[in-house]
Amino acid sequence: MVKFKSTEQVLKIIKNKDQIRNFGVIAHVDHGKTTMSDSLLAHSGIIAPSAAGQALAMDFDKEEQERGITIYQANVTLHYTQKEDEYVINMIDTPGHVDFSGRVIRSLRAIDGAVVVCDAVEGIMTQTETVTRMALEELVRPVLFINKVDRLIKELRLTPEKMQETLASVVSNFNQLLDTYAEPEYRDAWKVSIQDASVTFGSAKDKWAINVDVMKEKGITFKDVIDAYSEGKVDELVERAPLADAVLGMVVKHHPPPHVAQKYRIPKIWHGDLESDIGKALLACKDDGPTIMMVVNMVLDKAAGSVAIGRLFSGTIRDGQTVNIIDAKREGRVQSVNFFMGNQREQVGELGAGNIPALIGLADSRAGNTLSSIAGIKVFEGVSYVSEPVVQIAVEPKHPKDLPRLVEVLKQLTIEDPNLVVKIDEESGETIVSGMGVLHLDVATHRIQDAKVEIITSEPLINYRETVSSGCEAVMSKSPNRHNKIFMRVEPLEPTIGDMLRSGRISEMKDKKEMADLLKEQGWDTDTVKRVMKLDPRGNVMINGTKGVQFVQESTDSINSGFDDAMKEGPMCREQMRDCKFTFTHFVPHEDAAHRGLSQLGPASRRACMGALLTAGTSLLEPILAIEVRVPTDMVGNVATVLSSKSGKVMDMIQKGPASIVTGEIPASETFTLSEEMRGQTAGKAMWNSHFKRWAEVPKSRLAESISDIRKRKGLAPDPPTVSEFIDRE
């Protein structure tokens, strides 16, 4: 019998860490994550059992319920009883749509296990692979729930034997992901198996599930499942095999408790001294160790203000406690410690290591921050996002008086969602909002309107990047007063280092020795590493190549400022630069400090960088999306025709049941009218999704037109600037 546990009872159970599990639900969009999660909530008494599968209680944002997809990650604390043992299970339901994959990545840092939900008919899809890879990179152990088994019975009308064969094929394909992405020591140990009940089958919509353990205990066979549907006895099947028993039983059996998981996860996500007292406390998940927590999500609550949600890896967090927000180099006071029961926040006073607290009062905290009772400790490794903001819109208030309110709302949105980027265009004064895709931006604009700010938005536009494919000799630029000379050259930066900068693995916020070691691992010599002047998170570097020159040290900030300005907006189209390695080779400064301040050296540095880029020759990069289309087999040719007309290409085609899955690539700039054309060519029978795959050079056939279009919409002169506008002669 389901019994709802009070907060006091839950707190009593979690004193024993063996009784805690932290897991997330991850999946391809529309494979049934949130519907499954509802059944688990009903089992714990948080929603009515009759509403499970319909309430979408984990989609407690109005936008989520209207769209029928999960946009935010929602976390909840569940109670589960297995025979005589009681467990507290912290569950996070994550978005499935690729535009919100950043939220999935941050959630994975907080959990130790993942239930991967997969449609029995569609099988392993692109986003299934992506989220599973993310989980394995975070050393989060996956188990598999094959959902929508009712489709095999009602749509495909499979026999028990054929049904088992189909399910076994899904399991095999899933294990291939582990062969590809799991670290060697876990590759075999973490493979899922029907025989050990790390695979569960069921229907989240109909609220039943079975695995080997349930089948043995209840005497259920696949024939019984088919008979339940053919004889209209699904309710009896639900009574014998409720979904929550099978799924939560699988979680308890195969996912580790926090003190076990942290022994192998901490060395991966925290690069401090593991032999220190701090390191030992993290590895052991000690309640009496220093308080150390990583924030994975910020929620703005109308009543409580900022709520910082994260994983407490060490120590105990209490109401009224002062913590150091390490990344921000500030202190904050925890007003109250809470956990979530659905969309209800429960104040608990304190929580120990291994839990997922929700802290009120830390307004200066952001997702990714490390909180600690000890100042100056090593921060947790940053999370690596699989995509970048590639689509943008311009936003302005319909009524000018609402501008301050719009600025405030946008600030709140970027606190909640670090993948949303807001900037002011200095030329036009427009507010530009960039996101992972059109849906991401659509949701953001709805949030602004929900805040009672009427806005006008532009059509969505693609973000581009600029880079260099070759190097150049040093060029010279003078300051506005003509009294200072800066010499600069550029060459391509190793892509691996660019990726490490963008992921935050290499950062000026990190320990200098650790940064030096990482750069040496990439082949840089000791002297070059010592001379790093500036690390740009967009994926660019500046090296100090000067020798025996006066005033370089005191001029560094000004020169770095000019470098930063050049990296924000490259010379070709004023798009961000990436993968560029600059060397500041020589400096001829004015002797009087009054003549070599920021107003002089900043512009000179920017001009020198721009001159070097144009001398080397810049390339324009566009985002390329991977696309996956599910379509009736006789319409595969129509899909290929659409992709070809959009400068895309088909990479592969496989048949799955009555349909075929076409995978390919397409430039992001060609996707704005793709829905209409795909519907027209396939009579509305195609279902497709796409996600960012890589940056690629714009083909010469489209380059001139692309440059012209970008410069025109930015209000720039038709032609890019020339080298002579940035470099000076002796």
Curated annotation (Swiss-Prot):
Presence of keyword Translocase: no
Domain tr-type G: 18-238
Disordered as annotated region, ranges: 711-730
Alphabetical list of InterPro entries matching this protein: EF-G-like_DII, EFG_II, EFG_III/V, EFG_V-like, G_TR_CS, P-loop_NTPase, Ribosomal_Su5_D2-typ_SF, Ribsml_uS5_D2-typ_fold_subgr
Binding site for GTP: 27-34, 93-97, 147-150
UniProt-listed PROSITE patterns: G_TR_1, G_TR_2
Sites of Diphthamide modification: 595
SUPFAM superfamilies xref list: EF-G C-terminal domain-like (SSF54980), P-loop containing nucleoside triphosphate hydrolases (SSF52540), Ribosomal protein S5 domain 2-like (SSF54211), Translation proteins (SSF50447)
A GO CC term attached to the entry: cytosol
MF (Gene Ontology): GTP binding; GTPase activity; translation elongation factor activity
Location of this chain's protein in the cell: Cytoplasm
SMART domains: EFG_C, EFG_IV
Keywords, ordered alphabetically: Cytoplasm, Elongation factor, GTP-binding, Nucleotide-binding, Protein biosynthesis
Its job: Catalyzes the GTP-dependent ribosomal translocation step during translation elongation. During this step, the ribosome changes from the pre-translocational (PRE) to the post-translocational (POST) state as the newly formed A-site-bound peptidyl-tRNA and P-site-bound deacylated tRNA move to the P and E sites, respectively. Catalyzes the coordinated movement of the two tRNA molecules, the mRNA and conformational changes in the ribosome.
Family membership: Belongs to the TRAFAC class translation factor GTPase superfamily. Classic translation factor GTPase family. EF-G/EF-2 subfamily.
Protein name: Elongation factor 2
Lineage summary: Archaea, Nitrososphaerota, Candidatus Cenarchaeales, Candidatus Cenarchaeaceae, Candidatus Cenarchaeum
